[in-house]
Amino acid sequence: MILTVTLNPAIDVSYPLDELKCDTVNRVVDVTKTPGGKGLNVSRVLNDFGETVKATGCIGGESGDFIINHLPDSILSRFYKISGDTRTCIAILHEGNQTEILEKGPLLSVDEIDGFTHHFKYLLNDVDVVTLSGSLPAGMPDDYYQKLIGIANLNGKKTVLDCSGNALEAVLKGDSKPTVIKPNLEELSQLLGKEMTKDFDALKEVLQDKLFDGIEWIIVSLGADGVFAKHKDTFYNVDIPKIKIVSAVGSGDSTVAGIASGLANDEDDRALLTKANVLGMLNAQEKTTGHVNMANYDKLYQSIKIKEV
């Protein structure tokens, strides 16, 4: 079983407009509301793929109830209730662009943070892999993911971390390391304080930096150009085919789902990387975020090319 952690979930609201007009009224006909947050996207893709998945995080108010009520029944909801209201994130789709308005979310008390920590420990009993995705809610210290990873490690669980900024830096500088991190080039550049490109020699050099010591897998997303990955002392370039992209939103989360599934099933390097990239591409071919059409899985699987570099 795979446990997904979304500490700062949201209701994602989508407003499609032919044109966004500023300083006036914009009327929307087709409004879409879905449970949002990176970890919930991971949950839905794992569910589509047929994995047994348990979802947790901090939710509150009517928005929190909406999330529980609108997840597929086959996803085991094990959320922790807090006093604050779960946030709303708005995406305005206009003229081929996407403008986002993101609420910060609720402020958690010390007691609520401690309560979730105990809740997390309890949930580990029957899981093999834990995914930790997205931003931390207000009130949680930057090193909170580090704390959860330490607990998971003590219980022999594999962890996949997908976050950025101070939370990621705190994990890299801490003692407890995740099994996998999945930065993109922009996040990698931010971590290292220099601009990174798709130069494989440069990537090989920086991924051997002491900053990444103790992390078994580093999987760097190159967007439409695939992935550059390091597993222990082996480096891989994953080349993906060109596809028609409907929406790339959530494709990184779908890739995390594939990584987690690969770990849970003890797959070899090539199988794990192939599965992860296929799920990312399948999501990009869908209008709905965090959804994959498995009818196209086998064809895309055969089109992935992986080589050691």
Curated annotation (Swiss-Prot):
CDD domains, A to Z: FruK_PfkB_like
UniProt EC number: 2.7.1.144
Cellular component terms (Gene Ontology): cytosol
Record flagged with keyword ATP-binding: yes
GO molecular function (one): tagatose-6-phosphate kinase activity
Pathway: Carbohydrate metabolism; D-tagatose 6-phosphate degradation; D-glyceraldehyde 3-phosphate and glycerone phosphate from D-tagatose 6-phosphate: step 1/2
UniProt record, GO biological process: D-tagatose 6-phosphate catabolic process; lactose catabolic process via tagatose-6-phosphate
Catalysed transformations (reactions): D-tagatofuranose 6-phosphate + ATP = D-tagatofuranose 1,6-bisphosphate + ADP + H(+)
EC primary class: transferase
Keyword Metal-binding: no
UniProt keywords, alphabetically: ATP-binding, Kinase, Lactose metabolism, Nucleotide-binding, Transferase
Pfam families, sorted: PfkB
Top-level taxon in the UniProt lineage: Bacteria
Gene3D superfamilies cross-referenced by the UniProt entry: 3.40.1190.20
Family the UniProt entry places it in: Belongs to the carbohydrate kinase PfkB family. LacC subfamily.
Name of the featured protein: Tagatose-6-phosphate kinase
